[in-house]
Design a protein with these regions (language model features):
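A structural signal for small-residue-enriched, beta-sheet-centric alpha/beta enzyme cores
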Residues: 1-245
Length: 245
């Protein structure tokens, strides 16, 4: 009886905990000439780390797909999105990303080809928008940080290195204090165990006075690359988690 067009907005708000704003995203695509959509709602601001964390995400599509194609699409979509964000490096036991399809758009069942590619692109776009909202809403965060690592031996090592920097308390507090201490980035990369020659590293960072901070590292060891998103570590984060129960 509570179903309505505005129900999705109420659902966004109902699942919030320490979030400061509700999170929703929608993307559209075409299936055999018919308009279809992917819509998602999520919550999460703290205990956010790869392999998810204390976050909930519910994604819906009115396209028709079977369990196999849905699972494959979701696995692909979360890899560069939800599994490449971290607020504090802490995970929880109650994380979830759920994808449901009802076929209500009236097009035929999608199993592959161009329509499946279009669906996968729309799904990843929704996952990315929701994931980045979580980082921007990180508990106590004053900065949104993008860490791009290129030139690694492979993509896995690039992601490992980027995550090591993103989860470094020394790096995160330096960004909060607008302190360009790049030694903390190099130290985090070295401690991550990935292979590179420190003498070949190239490092660039945007202004730390801005809300959005971009960090770029080239390791000079190969062609692997990854991007991880995080936030700074502030006194407000400590206050929130010291008082939360």
């Amino acid at each position: 009886s509570s179903l309505s067009v505005s129900g999705i907005q109420r659902a966004q708000k109902a699942i919030m905990t320490t979030d400061t704003f509700s999170k929703g995203a929608t993307a559209f695509f075409s299936v055999s000439g018919r308009k279809a959509s992917v819509c998602g709602v999520a919550k999460g601001a703290g205990m956010i780390a790869p392999d998810m964390a204390t976050m909930l995400c519910f994604i819906f599509t009115d396209a028709a797909l079977g369990p196999g194609p849905l699972q494959a699409a979701l696995k692909k979509a979360v890899a560069p999105t939800f599994n490449c964000i971290t607020v504090d490096g802490c995970m929880s036991t109650n994380d979830n990303v759920i994808l449901l399809a009802n076929g209500a758009c009236g097009a035929g069942k999608i199993s592959g080809g161009k329509d499946y590619s279009s669906f996968c692109s729309a799904l990843e776009a929704v996952c990315r928008e929701l994931a980045l909202m979580m980082v921007r809403d990180g508990e106590g965060a004053s900065k949104f940080i993008s860490i791009s690592v290129e030139g690694a031996l492979n993509d896995r090592q690039a992601r490992t290195g980027a995550l090591a920097v993103a989860n470094s308390n020394l790096f995160k507090t330096a960004v909060y204090g607008e302190n360009r201490n790049f030694g903390r980035i190099i130290a985090a990369l070295g401690a991550s165990g990935i292979k590179f020659d420190p003498g070949k590293i190239r490092l660039k960072a945007g202004s730390l006075k801005r809300r959005d901070v971009d960090v770029y590292v080239h390791l000079g060891a190969g062609r692997g690359k990854a991007v991880v998103y995080t936030s700074d570590l502030t006194p407000e984060y400590i206050k929130i988690n010291a008082e939360y129960s």
